[in-house]
Amino acid sequence: MKIKNLEEALICFKENAIIHGECTQNGDYKRGNKSHKNIINAIKYISAEHKYEILEPLLEDNNLSVRIWAAYALLHVNTPKAVKALKEIVKNDSGIMGVNAEMTLDEFKKGNI
């Protein structure tokens, strides 16, 4: 998907974060890998425009996958907010999304993100 502006980047990010979460739940790795690529492309576009702040409202989105991906994208830009969002997910979700949030925090602490 070719992103042309910030609005498209945000839509692409959110839609694909939702898809990625669904694929994580149901094991559809092919579709999940495609959505992952689209999320990363959206993050790269947003980064190139220096507009990470458009992702901050997504830290409170109803969809856990959207929140996790927003936190991932913001870990080096707004570390306190991103870490807080991930910790809340770990605390409140005992399923795969909680595990994903915990792994994201662990990898960040190790310096791998």
Where are these regions (language model features)?
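Short inter-helical turns and helix N-cap capping residues of alpha-solenoid HEAT/ARM repeat scaffolds
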Residues: 62-63, 93-94
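Alpha-helical repeat scaffolds in large eukaryotic proteins
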Residues: 18-21
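Amphipathic alpha-helical scaffolding segments comprising HEAT/armadillo-like alpha-solenoid repeats
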Residues: 3-11, 23, 46-59, 79-91, ...
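Structural detector for internal amphipathic alpha-helices that build alpha-solenoid repeat scaffolds
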Residues: 2-4, 11-15, 26-47, 68-77, ...
